[in-house]
């Protein structure tokens, strides 16, 4: 599990390789990832946008920006949490993702929170120790 905290908002990520949706022969690898966003602060906030940077094992970067997550722009009061699962394909057996969410407070202040960088590893990925 990966974890980041920004302004009392915790984001945890748990990636999961899906062999049944992957094919070594076709160089298609697929992961799901479950994200939990927990508001430990004192004010209500809303997730407005997402910005992902996805990097495969060859260093190829892909940036994705969009409204909300999984079609929602959740509002989180103090102590509330939002959980969702999404997925990502890669042409390589490993890679990583990182990102940010734009939030807005009850008072209208916009700010960004970090999504922790997380590793996408399949059983086919060659391990390299530095």
Regions found by a protein language model. Give the residues of each.
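Short glycine/serine/proline-enriched coil/turn segments at secondary-structure junctions
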Residues: 23, 43-44, 91-95
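Detector for glycine-centered tight turns/loop "hinges" at secondary-structure junctions
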Residues: 8, 42, 59, 108-110
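Low-complexity, acidic Ser/Thr/Pro/Gly-rich terminal tails and inter-domain linkers that flank the onset
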Residues: 1-27
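Asparagine-centered strand-capping/turn motif at beta-strand->loop junctions
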Residues: 37-41
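Short acidic, flexible loop segments centered on an aromatic residue
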Residues: 43-62, 103
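Short, solvent-exposed loop/turn segments enriched in Ser/Thr/Gly
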Residues: 28-34, 97
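Terminal connector regions
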Residues: 89-130
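Intrinsically disordered, low-complexity Pro/Gly/Ser/Thr-rich segments with frequent PxxP/GP/PP motifs
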Residues: 62-94
């Amino acid at each position: 599990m990966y974890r980041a905290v920004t302004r009392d908002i915790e984001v945890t990520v748990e990636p999961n390789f899906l062999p049944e949706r992957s094919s070594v022969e076709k160089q298609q690898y697929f992961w799901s990832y479950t994200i939990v966003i927990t508001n430990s602060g004192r004010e209500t906030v809303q997730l407005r946008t997402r910005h992902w940077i996805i990097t495969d094992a060859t260093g190829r970067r892909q940036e994705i920006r969009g409204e909300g997550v999984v079609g929602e722009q959740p509002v989180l009061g103090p102590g509330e949490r939002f959980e969702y699962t999404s997925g990502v394909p890669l042409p390589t057996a490993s890679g990583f993702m990182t990102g940010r969410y734009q939030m807005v407070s009850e008072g209208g202040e916009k700010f960004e929170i970090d999504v922790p960088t997380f590793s996408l590893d399949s059983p086919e990925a060659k391990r390299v120790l530095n």
